[in-house]
């Protein structure tokens, strides 16, 4: 496993944090559009390693991209309590002149409805609610493989989810990901599968448990 020696975010007008450093492009009559992103690069090394087949690899130092991204957030107030929203985010290779696959992943693409009274429902391609409510507050280094095992199995594409409004510090969430065999010439033995995920998070000031 490569050891990350240095990971320095190079911050422009869009800022380093997608959540806190979004730039508002349009905000009028209940309609809002934000753009956000980051260019993050580091230096990785670690000497001799072995691949999954046990073959020797001499891994010297190199510049690496550390999850650079660019995205948009959209929202429209439907009523005083109901807001429709959407998000679209790409990952790109920030450390190379990659003209063919620079934007190499659609990381987020979803739409939803948010109510202060009834909670939030969304559908599409998004991070697991476990990751959003439990893992992220603890700043887990997912590039080192330290993440909930079901993150991609229960989210990221063909997913729907719901989480409650804040209930005196408690937030409950439920998420479902649909696996379909539609169009496959040789369906797998499991057939169509729905992978569920749920939990409860309690947060009070800097204290979080979930």
Show where each model-derived region lies:
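Gram-negative bacterial Sec-dependent N-terminal signal peptides
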Residues: 1-23
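Residues in and immediately flanking transmembrane alpha helices
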Residues: 15-16, 93, 210
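Outer membrane beta-barrel
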Residues: 24-45, 57-178, 192, 201-205
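Cytochrome P450 core scaffold surrounding the K-helix E-X-X-R motif
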Residues: 46-50
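Short, well-ordered secondary-structure micro-motifs
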Residues: 134, 184-186
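Conserved acidic, metal-coordinating active-site core of Asp-based
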Residues: 186, 193, 197-210
């Amino acid at each position: 496993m490569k050891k990350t020696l240095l990971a320095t975010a190079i911050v422009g007008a869009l800022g380093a944090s997608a959540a806190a450093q979004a730039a508002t492009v349009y905000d009028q009559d209940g309609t809002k559009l934000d753009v956000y992103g980051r260019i993050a690069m580091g230096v990785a090394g670690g000497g001799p390693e072995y691949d999954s087949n046990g073959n020797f690899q001499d891994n010297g130092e190199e510049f690496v991209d550390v999850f650079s991204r660019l995205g948009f957030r959209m929202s429209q107030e439907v009523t005083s309590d109901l807001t429709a929203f959407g998000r679209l985010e790409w990952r790109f290779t920030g450390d190379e002149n990659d003209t063919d696959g620079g934007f190499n992943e659609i990381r987020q693409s979803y739409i939803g409805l948010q109510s202060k009274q009834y909670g939030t429902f969304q559908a599409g391609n998004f991070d697991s609610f476990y990751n959003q409510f439990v893992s992220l507050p603890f700043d887990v280094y997912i590039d080192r493989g330290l993440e909930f095992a079901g993150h991609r199995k229960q989210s990221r594409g063909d997913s729907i989810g719901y989480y409650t409004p804040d209930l005196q510090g408690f937030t409950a969430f439920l998420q479902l990901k649909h696996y379909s065999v539609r169009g496959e010439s040789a369906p797998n033995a499991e057939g169509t599968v729905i992978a569920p995920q749920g939990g409860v998070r309690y947060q009070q000031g800097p204290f979080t448990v979930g």
